[in-house]
Swiss-Prot record:
Record-linked PANTHER family: AT-RICH INTERACTIVE DOMAIN-CONTAINING PROTEIN 5A, RBP-RELATED
GO CC entries: nucleolus; nucleoplasm; nucleus; transcription regulator complex
Name under which the protein is recorded: AT-rich interactive domain-containing protein 5A
Domain called ARID: residue spans: 55-147
Pfam families xref list: ARID
Species annotation: Homo sapiens (Human)
Cross-link (Glycyl lysine isopeptide (Lys-Gly) (interchain with G-Cter in ubiquitin)): 85, 94
UniProt region (Disordered), positions on chain: 1-56, 146-223, 281-331, 426-454
Region (Interaction with SOX9): 1-300
């Protein structure tokens, strides 16, 4: 019992020795009683102290910052606004330091977080970029100065990739563009020779082989769709080059709209110039007759685009006489012959329909310029001179009964609708039933005398027509020159070459029928480019008669006079005695559309 007591005493004595350090306990109790009063006052006092310290730090920071930037010769004259609030340089400095300094914030793309801490509007789209740029310009140099770092150049920000072409511009422009141009040229050279060889091989198959009808129809459609000056051998290649060079996806990649427009304009301009040069080169070749030459005019492309070309449907193509497509395909590539294409303009009070379908348009070969027929079974010479608008007066034609042409080589065209015309008296003169195959000058003069009686009247331009004839009346024997005569019209006299010097064909301004123009007689209300049409009384008397593929049964000599008036300049007079009836229809109306 004594031992524990001694132990307790020892502990008590030790406790007494240790009591002075533990003496604050009662004071602690007293503090515990007094703490509520001090705790109530401490947050305000501590908050005020912290605010005072922050203000002092902020003030010292701003003073040193402004001083440093002034010494650096980049003074801060005006603090910019960000998010409809003026930037607090102290807050932006503390926010960046809190997120891990400039490099870390830039690497992790945390500038939007810095902007949010500054209290900017949340709808700003350029918040991060603007915050970073303001910090780099106003605060970063001083922060690096405080840390003892050198003023390093700012890290380059990654540019926004607008288009893929930006990668090419980083390197040497010449080194990257030259190989690309060379590759494009090689690719075009590889593509174009194959196409040209295929195009050249298609129109000239072996005589023993029959080309499929589908290929001929496709060639016809392709040649009709491509706008060409002299035929299918001119500009379609240029347009293929244009399309293939521009729409090649691997060439340019994703391009801006402005770059696309510039490239398309350059390519189309170059191709148009090449197309015109090829057209002029082909038109100047001596293959065509010097008398008939396609006039180059600025109106010709417009006329070509406005000219709607129709093709035979597959059913109509199958109804063609047997062997006609074969013989045309066997004819091989022939020189492109000039075909009169243009846009006729009339007086505002007159009506003239645009040019459209003609029997020669039923075949792409004929439209492309193959006017010579194949050698017939009767042993006709292949080297027959190429015919232009027609033959001579002595050559028999398919337009009259006395002709020796017994067959046709193209299918029968459909009849066109004729617009209502002026009323015709019942006692209008009628055409003679038959005509000699080779009429002389006397018959020509008599027809001209008959044709100019009603020339004093104003001729209204009426819609031309095509009448359908029974093909059974014509023989089934094909002949090469017969096709040309059927297509191009009957005998036509020599045409003066001066008629083609203008940009358009002219017509006489008056049809008086006297050796010189009468001074007292008023001229017809036609402009120099107007082509007169059929008179109404002549249209009424022209009945159906045996003819080739629906072409009208007209006297061959009347075409001579009609074409002469079409092709001669407006100043030339009509040297013919006065006549009674006008019976000279114009052949070009067969090529018009209602």
């Amino acid at each position: 019992m004594a031992a524990p007591v001694k132990g307790n005493r020892k502990q008590s004595t030790e406790g007494d020795a240790l009591d002075p350090p533990a003496s604050p306990k009662p004071a602690g109790k007293q503090n515990g009683i007094q703490n509520p009063i001090s705790l109530e006052d401490s947050p305000e006092a501590g908050g005020e102290r912290e605010e005072e310290q922050e203000r002092e730090e902020e003030q010292a920071f701003l003073v040193s910052l402004y001083k440093f930037m002034k010494e650096r010769h980049t003074p801060i004259e005006r603090v910019p606004h960000l998010g409809f609030k003026q930037i607090n340089l102290w807050k932006i400095y503390k926010a960046v330091e809190k997120l891990g300094a400039y490099e870390l914030v830039t690497g992790r793309r945390l500038w939007k977080n810095v902007y949010d801490e500054l209290g900017g509007s949340p709808g700003s789209t350029s918040a991060a970029t603007c915050t970073r740029r303001h910090y780099e310009r106003l605060v970063l140099p001083y922060v690096r100065h405080l840390k003892g770092e050198d003023d390093k150049p700012l890290p380059t920000s990654k540019p926004r990739k607008q288009y893929k072409m930006a990668k090419e511009n980083r390197g040497d422009d010449g080194a990257t563009e030259r190989p690309k141009k060379a590759k494009e040229e090689r690719r075009m050279d590889q593509m174009m020779p194959g196409k040209t060889k295929a195009d050249a091989a298609d129109p000239a198959p072996l005589p023993s082989q029959e080309p499929p009808r589908n290929s001929t129809e496709q060639q016809g459609l392709a040649s009709g769709s491509s706008v060409s000056f002299v035929g299918a051998s001119g500009c379609p290649e240029a347009y293929k080059r244009l399309l293939s060079s521009f729409y090649c996806k691997g060439t340019h990649g994703i391009m801006s709209p402005l770059a696309k427009k510039k490239l398309l304009a350059q390519v189309s301009k170059v191709e148009a110039l090449q197309c015109q040069e090829e057209g002029c080169r082909h038109g100047a070749e001596p293959q065509a007759s010097p008398a008939v030459h396609l006039p180059e005019s600025p109106q010709s492309p417009k006329g070509l685009t406005e000219n709607s070309r129709h093709r035979l449907t597959p059913q109509e193509g199958l109804q063609a006489p047997g062997g006609s497509l074969r013989e045309e395909a066997q004819a091989g590539p022939c020189p492109a012959a000039p075909i009169f294409k243009g846009c006729f303009y009339t007086h505002p009070t007159e009506v003239l329909k645009p040019v459209s379908q003609h029997p020669r348009d039923f075949f792409s070969r004929l439209k492309d310029g193959v006017l010579l027929g194949p050698p017939g079974k009767e042993g006709l010479s292949v080297k027959e001179p190429q015919l232009v608008w027609g033959g001579d007066a002595n050559r028999p034609s398919a337009f009259h009964k006395g002709g020796s042409r017994k067959g046709i080589l193209y299918p029968k065209p459909k009849a066109c609708w004729v617009s209502p015309m002026a009323k015709v008296p019942a006692e209008s003169p009628t055409l003679p039933p038959t005509f000699p195959s080779s009429p002389g000058l006397g018959s020509k003069r008599s027809l001209e005398e008959e044709g100019a009686a009603h020339s004093g009247k104003r001729l209204r331009a009426v819609s031309p027509f095509l009448k359908e004839a029974d093909a059974k009346k014509c023989g089934a024997k094909p002949a090469g020159s017969g096709l040309v005569s059927c297509l191009l019209g009957p005998a036509l006299g020599p045409v003066p070459p001066e008629a083609y010097r203008g940009t358009m064909l002219h017509c006489p301004l008056n049809f008086t029928g006297t050796p010189g123009p009468l001074k007292g007689q008023a001229a017809l209300p036609f402009s120099p480019l107007v082509i007169p049409a059929f008179p109404a009384h002549f249209l009424a008397t022209a009945g159906p008669s045996p003819m080739a593929a629906g072409l009208m049964h007209f006297p061959p000599t009347s075409f001579d006079s009609a074409l002469r008036h079409r092709l001669c300049p407006a100043s030339s007079a009509w040297h013919a005695p006065p006549v009674t009836t006008y019976a000279a229809p114009h052949f070009f109306h067969l090529n018009t559309k209602l």
